[in-house]
Amino acid sequence: MTNLVQFPGLGLSFELSRVAFSIGDIDIYWYGICIAFGLCLALVFAFRRCTEFGIDADSMVDVILIGVVLGIASARLYYVAMAPYNYNTIWDVLAVRDGGLAIYGGIIGAFVFGGLACKWRGVPVLPMFDLAGMGFLIGQGCGRWGNFFNQEAFGCNTTLPWGMFSEATEDYLMGSTVTVPKGVTIDPAMPVHPTFLYESIWCFVGLALLVAYIKKRKFNGDIALRYLVWYGAGRFWIEALRTDSLLLVPSLGLRASQLVAAAAVVGGVALEIFLTRKYKSKPLMVTLALTAENRSLLAKVHKAEPEFTVEREELVASSPRKLFLERTNAYNERVKQQLKEKLAEKKDA
């Protein structure tokens, strides 16, 4: 089934199908492809930048895998919890190929389970959250285009030039599940706000701002807090335009996601102000990451000599990426040599 999607004010129209291609009897949806594409871009970004945050790439992979898998599961559970009456069987709950993920559920799940995975793999938690915040913006910016192919997550009527119209928007707005503030009327035959586009643009603008701020960050967790504030602020006003989310206070048009977004903004701003004042007098120092190989060697040395420690090396966060790479490689070479010599001594003894 295809949808004719039109932007009348711009003179544009697109014939869209939710299904990108099929493998046998299995349909592969654009929604899933957009999410997968965003995830791949976020992974590339994380691998390129992790050294600047004192994170070893090999250990980071385990954290990301756990965070992604359980984050997606949390996103689905959050979505189902918002409208449990739409799901009759466990198979309905598990059917996510064609949509049905709540971003805030994914964010919460990824931070919680990703944080636990960091503890397990010895990855610094707050620097990982900083990196994840930028990764989220990449994934969310790309993933929202899945809503475009599905023709979902759009807003109320608009007369703006970029207003969007399709049979899917018309059919949905004629249904009984539309949620709009009291006093707001909807005309199914009129164009609607392409809120997926608003959020995608908002995410990529936020990404550019946070990347520019990497060298200026004041404390570990700084970028993660700014991510929460930026995304929360955008989500709050974009959500007000939506017609498909749960209204908590119909008379005010207040939605569940707006409440979460407001809490993220208020809490994030308060913490940002407090921590910036606390750490403004000294530059942020990044502890260089040990490779997985060196941590394994260190564990062997600890078995024979529990009190043995490896000297840490730090670098100012504002240092160039090239310097981080050079110093991290040199540091790990020295540590590897030191640990191998220590193991040889123990073996000879």
Model-derived regions, located:
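A feature for loop-to-transmembrane-helix boundaries and adjacent hydrophobic helices
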Residues: 1-349
